[in-house]
Amino acid sequence: TRFRNVTGVQTCALPISFGEHVYTALFATSLSPIVTEFAFVLQLPGRAGILLGIFIGVSVGLIIPPLAAHLKVVHKGYSLYNIGFTAGILGTVYVSLLRSYGYQTGFNMIWSDGNDRLFLGFLLLLFIFFILLGLCSGRGLASSLKTIFRQSGRSCEDFIELSGISASLVNIGINGLIGTAYVLLVCGPLNGPTIGGILTIAGFGACGKHARNIIPVLFGVMLGSLTKVWNINDPAVLLAALFGTSLAPIAGRYGWAWGVVAGFLNSSVALCSSALHGGMNLYNTGFSA
């Protein structure tokens, strides 16, 4: 049985009653910092904090599926991170409640560097493995890849269903190499957050992203660094570029020029939107996109 869930991905329902919502549940963990905030950071007496954190986490899980299904019509599938958008709005509500009672959320930036050689070797091996696996496991690969590159990516088009697993594996590997090359090109470090962004670009190589629609968005962020006050390798800007490829369908549908514009604009919005939810939404760029 096939369905299109609130993340926008058309896929097969898992053979369990919860199967239809597994994908939404995985993306909904973007609001997991809220649970920690209520359970431990607020320092409520006794076990009240832990119980409140559990209650808040369960409430997030209950609210996100119907809310995401409704909010998908706002961007009409041109943002691949629909749950990130939904989580940003829901996180803003929770943080607003906290602030109305006098509690201010804080930001804690932990940003490592100096491990580029180790992580680069791992990423190159991983993505080259995907490409080789795709090359060795399918026929008619060139035409299948052309089919993928012709797609806009809107509403998370399922490339595995469209062109097969082999072409999708190659596309995943290519996307991962592009993301890695971008970080190195702008002299950014390979660390937890940037590797997360690279792996996200690679993962969505199976449903929405390919070289033709992500490169214009990345270029738009680079263009913004020439005219705006921040540096291209600032932590927030690096993440805005990598996760900003959520807007890849705009480049796929309307052309590279509008993809550049989307990346240029989103790089500014992403730097301000985190103040709304106090950093509680881990998919902040999905919210700004």
Region annotations inferred by a language model:
Residues 19-28, 78-85, 213-220, 237-239:
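Cytoplasmic-side transmembrane-helix entry/capping segments in multi-pass membrane proteins
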Residues 21, 32-60, 64-120, 256, ...:
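Membrane-interface helix-loop-helix junctions at boundaries between adjacent transmembrane segments
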Residues 22, 51-59, 120-124, 169-173, ...:
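Hydrophobic alpha-helical transmembrane segments
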Residues 15, 28-42, 60-69, 225-230, ...:
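Short helix-perturbing small/polar motifs within transmembrane alpha-helices
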Residues 2, 46-60, 186-195, 232-239:
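Structural signature of hydrophobic alpha-helical transmembrane segments
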Residues 1-12:
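Single conserved hydrophobic/aromatic residue that forms the stacking wall/gate
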